[in-house]
Amino acid sequence: MSKTIATENAPAAIGPYVQGVDLGNMIITSGQIPVNPKTGEVPADVAAQARQSLDNVKAIVEAAGLKVGDIVKTTVFVKDLNDFATVNATYEAFFTEHNATFPARSCVEVARLPKDVKIEIEAIAVRR
């Protein structure tokens, strides 16, 4: 049985979906765009957008009682694969800052994202 994960520390869903689901041993987040949950603002550059998206994922994972180190898989959606190196640097710094092992990851270029942001990130975390 799944439980809905909801937190004010990540942006509210902008469609008919939830921020995340808790399956007991596994947490699955919805894709997180770089919206600051307090201000509703979106940073301009892709590095700041990547960081905000990761912070939003972290907030959902933590709302389920887990931590960044429990994330085992992410999917990164970018509007421009030329941003790959910048996103990688931000991503590496984020997981290093949280003393977390890098999770498995997919990264794909997409034509468009909600609110015309440059990046969206979703994650799977597990209870150990």
From Swiss-Prot:
<dbReference type="GO" id="GO:0120242">
    <property type="term" value="F:2-iminobutanoate deaminase activity"/>
</dbReference>
<comment type="function">
    <text>Accelerates the release of ammonia from reactive enamine/imine intermediates of the PLP-dependent threonine dehydratase (IlvA) in the low water environment of the cell. It catalyzes the deamination of enamine/imine intermediates to yield 2-ketobutyrate and ammonia. It is required for the detoxification of reactive intermediates of IlvA due to their highly nucleophilic abilities. Involved in the isoleucine biosynthesis.</text>
</comment>
<keyword id="KW-0216">Detoxification</keyword>
<comment type="subunit">
    <text>Homotrimer.</text>
</comment>
<dbReference type="Pfam" id="PF01042">
    <property type="entry name" value="Ribonuc_L-PSP"/>
</dbReference>
<protein>
    <recommendedName>
        <fullName>2-iminobutanoate/2-iminopropanoate deaminase</fullName>
        <ecNumber>3.5.99.10</ecNumber>
    </recommendedName>
</protein>
<dbReference type="GO" id="GO:0070207">
    <property type="term" value="P:protein homotrimerization"/>
</dbReference>
<dbReference type="GO" id="GO:0019239">
    <property type="term" value="F:deaminase activity"/>
</dbReference>
<keyword id="KW-0378">Hydrolase</keyword>
<dbReference type="InterPro" id="IPR019897">
    <property type="entry name" value="RidA_CS"/>
</dbReference>
<comment type="similarity">
    <text>Belongs to the RutC family.</text>
</comment>
<comment type="pathway">
    <text>Amino-acid biosynthesis; L-isoleucine biosynthesis; 2-oxobutanoate from L-threonine.</text>
</comment>
<dbReference type="GO" id="GO:0032991">
    <property type="term" value="C:protein-containing complex"/>
</dbReference>
<dbReference type="GO" id="GO:0009097">
    <property type="term" value="P:isoleucine biosynthetic process"/>
</dbReference>
<keyword id="KW-0100">Branched-chain amino acid biosynthesis</keyword>
<dbReference type="GO" id="GO:0005829">
    <property type="term" value="C:cytosol"/>
</dbReference>
<dbReference type="InterPro" id="IPR035959">
    <property type="entry name" value="RutC-like_sf"/>
</dbReference>
<keyword id="KW-0412">Isoleucine biosynthesis</keyword>
<feature type="site" description="Stabilizes the substrate">
    <location>
        <position position="17"/>
    </location>
</feature>
<dbReference type="GO" id="GO:0051082">
    <property type="term" value="F:unfolded protein binding"/>
</dbReference>
<dbReference type="GO" id="GO:0016020">
    <property type="term" value="C:membrane"/>
</dbReference>
<dbReference type="GO" id="GO:0042802">
    <property type="term" value="F:identical protein binding"/>
</dbReference>
<keyword id="KW-0028">Amino-acid biosynthesis</keyword>
<keyword id="KW-0963">Cytoplasm</keyword>
<dbReference type="GO" id="GO:0009636">
    <property type="term" value="P:response to toxic substance"/>
</dbReference>
<feature type="binding site">
    <location>
        <position position="105"/>
    </location>
    <ligand>
        <name>substrate</name>
    </ligand>
</feature>
<feature type="site" description="Important for catalytic activity at high pH">
    <location>
        <position position="120"/>
    </location>
</feature>
<dbReference type="GO" id="GO:0120243">
    <property type="term" value="F:2-iminopropanoate deaminase activity"/>
</dbReference>
<dbReference type="InterPro" id="IPR006175">
    <property type="entry name" value="YjgF/YER057c/UK114"/>
</dbReference>
<dbReference type="InterPro" id="IPR006056">
    <property type="entry name" value="RidA"/>
</dbReference>
